[in-house]
Every structure is written in C-alpha cells, then in structure tokens.
Amino acid sequence: MFKFKASDLPEILTRWSARYSVFVPSGSPDNAQMRIWSRRTRKEVRFMEPDEYTNLIVAPKGFVFGEREELFRWGGHEKTCTALSAPYSSSLQEEDKILCGLRPCDTYGLAYMDRFFLGEHHDINYHWRRQHVFIVAVNCLEAGPECYCASMGTGPFAEITAHTEYGMQAGKGDGRLRTPDYGPDHKKGEKGENDWYWVEAGSDRGKALLSHVAPLLYRDLEFTGRRRKKALQEDALKTFRRTLDTSTVRQVLAAHFKDEEWDAIASSCIACTGCTRVCPTCTCFTTEEEQDTPHSGTRVRVWDSCQSVSFTRNAEFH
C-alpha cells in the first residue's frame, strides 16, 4: 500500500496526462462533470476535492458505450452488399483514458455494463472502448442526502471484483489505486490526517499507472493502511440517512403491481427518455442505417430507451 501528499495530486494528474487522456470531476457541487485535464488546461479545469461533490451529474457510461457509434460501413451493387470496414478501423481509434474521481456506485454501474456487453455475447465495439479506459474511483467518507448504496452493496467504498480488469481505485485519507479485471482501476479515499491519499494497485495495469508517478509515492505499512481504511469505512456507513431492505423487493413490487400510484407517476412522464440517458446501467440501443448513396451507407448503433413504447414494441414483436 502506498500514499501520496494531497498537494502532489495535480502533479500526478499532469504526469499521467503525458501518457493518457485524463478526465477529472470539475464544475460546481451540483453540476460536477468529467473534463479533460492536461498541463495546458490545469488552470481552467480544477479537480474537485472528494468532499466538494456527491457524484457526477451524468453517469460515465458514455466513455465505454458510445451514444452513437459506427458498427460497419457497407456498399455494393443492386443485388450485392458487402461490409467494407470493421468498427475498430474507423470511429474507435482513440487514446487510453483515465477517468479519475468516479464514485464507487458508478464503478459498479460500469461493472454491470461489462457483464452485459462482455458476457455470453461479446460486443467488439464495447470491448474496444473498454480496454482503453482506466478508472480511478474515489471512496466516499460521507453519504449524500439521497444515497442508499450501502443497502445495495455498491458503496460507500469500492471493492475489487472478479469482472474488473480495467479498474482502479484511490482515496484521500483512505483509498486504493488498483486495476482489476473490468472494473475500477484506481480507488482513492478521502481527506485523512495531514491530507494524504492512500492508494493500492490491484492489477498489472494499476501498477503501471503507479509506476509513472513512483517518485511521488511513499510506501505505507500494510497493517496501518488497512486498519485506517476499515475505520473510515465504518464511519462512512454511519452517515447514511436512507436505507433499503432489498430482501423483499420482488414480493413488494408484485403485491403493488396494479397500484394507482404508478398511474400518478406515469401521468407526469413526457417520454423525454432522460431517465434512461442518465441511468448508469441502461444498455438499451437500436441500430439505424445511414445511407450515403443508393448502394452504400453506414450501420450505426445509438442509445435507445427501454421506457419508450416503440422500444417495447420492437422488443416484443421483433
């Protein structure tokens, strides 16, 4: 386990930016968004401290699941059509990215998408994007007023799981810099004594990130770091204002399936699909043909919403 001074964080981000495209939370507490960090932009893009924001205003899934992405181009003649390019030969040529400052709940959202796109039906486009993304997750020392991740097992601290190859975690006061198989690459905690970040690498990719900033790291005693982490985690669990018993969710939903309350909620819906666009686990998409000429075009995949009538009809009658 390692630690580094909080005052060295800008330099660590700058050193990473020499090799990767580094994105950090920036903005205001109620409008935190991922913005690119570099030596050139560091004066305009300020990395928000972990205690300055509860979470990003938009889930980070767009970094691995493009809102619009090309599947392949096609062309031919009146009776013959041939695919002309693979997805990774055109729109998916991109640099390695570090997403620094993700909350544990969002890392679990990405882990869910990993299982969906990289499971039985392996999605080439998703895999291509995912392998270029490192995740630096920041542990939460205080729950937000609407948070209930502890009840879902998705926070307030991120944990390494078997499906996390491209993840990492770190933290100020407690944290881990780690890169598992498809998940958080680096985990950061929060403010601790004398403003230190505790970090721990969890894979070879995470170790590589640490090696780039080795001169700024201090080795910490494993026992001391883990004991401190446990204490911080226990304190964080005491800050939750909302809890949810998930053991009976299925029975409760089934018992209230026809309640009038659902009609009252639905009456305010204007079918904007904004709910699924910000949902960190929505994997819904549809495909479209963008025709260039009568005999050539591009097949693209775009986000769709499982809450729209047309999506339900397509899924039912396809």
Spans of features found by a protein language model:
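Histidine- and/or cysteine-centered catalytic micro-motif in compact active-site loops
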Residues: 204, 274, 280-287, 311
